[in-house]
Amino acid sequence: MTGQGRLERRDGAGYEGDFLDGQMHGKGTYSWADRRVYQGAFRNDKRHGSGTLRWPNGNQYVGDFLDNRRTGTGRFVSAENDVYEGEFLNDQMHGNGAYVWSDGRRYEGLFRDGVKSGMGVLTWPTGNTYEGQFLEDQRHGLGVLYWRDGTTYQGLFALNQMNGYGVKTIPNEVPVFQQWRMGDLLEAWPIVESDRCRLNIDDAPWIFAGSSCINGQAHGSGIAVSVDGQAYIVNGRFVLGRLIQGDVKALPSPESQ
């Protein structure tokens, strides 16, 4: 069959539209027995090209299809009025996109296999914002958390919690280098330059919290954070104000909001 036609299947599904050599090919409408409906392009008996897929619960997708799957760019609106616009792969949100929840939350960034994974920005209706790494739908890795009042935390996260080391800055207060364990604050060190125990790395001043100082120089084992709050060292070894052993790790830089 070639041209316009109608097809009815034993399982209750049906198609009405263009055919080419007996296959759905061109523009048409396909309906399933469960009341899903697809309207759009077909190629070689498959949904392929631009189209609209509607579910009986009110969900709707408008965008690209490839070999029967949502692949390419598109817009998905849920029955709850959540909206996603961006890239899809094999029926999943995958790649760059933006998701807006009906409660006002918004995420813009990378998705993988249907969840937030990679770099992104999450904003709450309160005005608070997180910018950084995500893994399997959770804040995980390096990031910066911005509060509406101007407070920032730049550091490590795990499973949506502050976890590891970071710098918290409150307006009109001294920045504080902190250690967290799954949302619980373990220790904190104000970042204040002092002549009592000096430390310089790459000609920049650092704050040292360690075992001892000799002649005003950082000496022994301990942790250190740069005065600008952009880097830190854990389990370092220092001799008379110099780093002998330990890795310098960068912290994300907060930008003006």
Task: For every predicted segment, state its role.
Residues M1-Q257:
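Glycine/tyrosine- and acidic-biased, solvent-exposed loop/turn segments at the edges of beta-strands
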